[in-house]
Amino acid sequence: MILNARPEPIAFPTSASALIVVDMQNAYASEGGYLDLAGFDVSATAPIITNIKRAITAARAAGIQVIFFQNGWDPQYVEAGGEGSPNWHKSNALKTMRKQPELMGKLLAKGDWDYALVDELQPQAGDIVIAKPRYSGFFNTQLDSILRAKGIHHLIFTGIATNVCVESTLRDGFFFEYFGVVLEDATHQAGPDFAQKAALYNIETFFGWVSDVETFCNCIAPSAQLSQSA
């Protein structure tokens, strides 16, 4: 298959590709979730959820592996690291809870509403769900071994936040020899609009490719696969 993308089209075999859904949790996409409580704007996430759902449906129909990430830690936050970890100092979730102690145990804690995937994007049989304790989906997870065992080397990214966990995972994948593509209208930034633009610029210039949901879905549709193989 040939996917139209920036800065140039990229060939990818559906059997060796995975659609990555990054952190589509209440924490990042819902009012009352961590990002919202930390002061980030989540008002524009509804169309992102719709676009991701469309990409997931198309990927499943084409036989592309769907992988969901969930970012967070145990309820005691041992996995978050203590003061000896830079994560303790830089995580906005941890900083928000230190400022508002009544939120302790409620933000990004496994088993809580904040940690849960949004209702619209629920895994189905055959999908893979991976818990991750840091921005990158490759850090302290089984992602790399799962992908290699399945012969997957092309990763199509969706999710939140483009400039944090999406970009971090794609960058790490680049260093592990994975081809990374971001569907720009199925991602959303944490912060101002320029954060989205900067992340996409970095990706398409240095680490991967950028496409969109319409192009992706049309590319992997059965009719498109038949025409490209003819």
From Swiss-Prot:
InterPro entries: Isochorismatase-like_dom, Isochorismatase-like_hydrls, Isochorismatase-like_sf, RutB. The keyword Cell membrane does not apply. The keyword Hydrolase applies. It catalyses: (Z)-3-ureidoacrylate + H2O + H(+) = (Z)-3-aminoacrylate + NH4(+) + CO2; (Z)-3-ureidoacrylate + H2O = (Z)-3-aminoacrylate + carbamate + H(+); (Z)-2-methylureidoacrylate + H2O + H(+) = (Z)-2-methylaminoacrylate + NH4(+) + CO2. Pfam families: Isochorismatase (PF00857). Keywords: Hydrolase. This is Ureidoacrylate amidohydrolase RutB. The gene is rutB.
